[in-house]
Amino acid sequence: MGILKNNKRSFDFVFLNRPHIAIKYIDFIRQNMYAKVIYYGHDLHYMRLQREYDLMGDEKTLYDFKYYRNLEYSLLYKADVSYYPSYKEVEEIKKVDDTLRVKAINAYMFDEKDIIHRDFSKTKDILFVGGFSHDPNVDAIRWLHESIMPRIKARNSEINLIVVGSNPTEEVINICNEGGYILKGFVSDDELLNLYNETRIVIAPLRYGAGIKGKIIEAMANGAAIITTNCGAEGIVDAPYFMKITDDAQDFAGQILKLYDNFEELKNLSIETQKVINRRFTMEAAWNIVKDDFE
């Protein structure tokens, strides 16, 4: 703190992120520095917690929701401008106070590359990617196991679910010990790229969470055909045009089965996701949104 205070005229901007971290420093910065404060929230934590409470009904989650709602709006009022990775958070914040300076930015950027024309007849199985320190990913595997995979196996016993993600819980491990699951756990970037190339469909059956999902953007950048929920697709403009979206377990299983052997549609979805990445998720597109804040 002393270094910042003693050099307060040397900094034009201070970039804070994550509410539980930013709240420790923002008052000090405001009181002792002249820098413009930019806050990046990643997602609205209270939205995610509210959805978890609505689904699970846990009183501790309700307490956390109220705590983070107060915390996050305190930061929004104290920052000069706040960034979030999708328009959904901006809409939610503007409902509370339209005067708050908040922007949806591109949190993910890629170099433009040639479109991959994948031969889906040479692929197999379905892929889930998500770290299991994050509760919504554990819930997604639970929902898959209880309500989706049995419907798939009843129609096509050859389809396996490949599960990628660090720190799998005991529940996830036990589920994956049953037939039809292949638990990879943590994998290297190269191995993950191979899995994107080798599997037929990427699924993200998220029932709660908030904000744009990195796992979805990553799958799009790798030319995946994607099936997800409205929560999984949240914040991605025009998502229904290049991925399958449903919140119903029976329909989710049906979408997998319907798409699995439709190589033409798989290819079309793959091409469209890559076009969206090349058009929207570039350094130039990101800079155009924020450049005025750094003048």
Annotate each predicted stretch with a short phrase.
Residues F11-D12, D80, N197-G211, N222-A224:
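Acidic donor-binding loop of glycosyltransferase active sites
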Residues K5-K24, I38:
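Short N-terminal targeting/anchoring amphipathic segment
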Residues K215-A219, A225-T228:
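Short hydrophobic beta-strand element within catalytic cores of glycosyltransferases
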Residues E264-F294:
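A charged, aromatic-enriched C-terminal amphipathic alpha-helix characteristic of glycosyltransferases
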Residues N32-Q50:
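Active-site proximal beta-strand in glycosyltransferases
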Residues H45, K60-S82:
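Membrane-proximal helix-turn-helix segments that form the acceptor-binding/catalytic region
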Residues F242-Q250, K258-F263:
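Conserved acidic donor-binding segment of nucleotide-sugar-dependent glycosyltransferases
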Residues Y77-K78, Y83, K88, K95-T99, ...:
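Conserved catalytic-core segment of nucleotide-activated headgroup transferases in glycan assembly
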